[in-house]
Amino acid sequence: MKAIILAAGLGSRLEELTKDRPKCLVEYKNMPLISYQLNAFLKAGINDIAVVGGYKFEVLKNYLNANFKKVKLYENTDFASSNMTYTMFCAREFMDDDTIISYSDIIYDYEFIELLKACKNELSVMVDKNWLELWKQRFSDPLSDAESMEIQDGFIKELGKKVTHIDKIDAQYIGLFKFNKSFLSSVFEVWDNLDKNRYYDSKNWKNIYMTSFLTEIINKFDNAKAIFAPKNWLEIDQKTDLEIDIF
């Protein structure tokens, strides 16, 4: 079992907090965001971990070398003109076993990882069906940032679209999922076959949202198992998120 943390982003909505560091090194309760994910993986028994950096790469490299020496580091040199999915495939060579993918701006406990480890499905996606409570703390209008998700018989049928009504949201995608080793060749095939002349939810292939990429997989394989978040978690996307005390 392996893990990849996607940490190439700038985090512009955190304003001056990312002037001298990547978003993943912004602190929540006096600890860098990425340390929460790394500690969760380690506590769950996953030691084969890679991080893909980009913005302020040397700062991230120095932090990992000082605190998590065994982590393998990859670089997305095109971080300014690409998105999360492209960042993930910068570590493609690392993906040769069951692999959990995590965003670097989310905070969760090791129990989330244990649930993904235990799932035998080809693609398992952590989702939060109790998302609204958190979103009400984060936004005056929760629907302004929430995205759609349709779940049928435990499998995700659709996700990642803007919504105007809460009924379109069975749960919220949190940015944490797993590809089983046996399914990785199919994942690579979907990526390699993206139409370079097409736009995916208004983004070109290099900037395709992760939810749009997962949608491409779902449309072809219909195999995305929903794994429900066992407890509170937190996303840090704006400065006010750092004031939320639920984790």
Predicted regions and their residues:
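Conserved beta-strand segments of alpha/beta enzyme cores
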Residues: 24, 70-72, 155, 223-225
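Short catalytic helix/loop segments, enriched in acidic residues and glycine
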Residues: 20-35
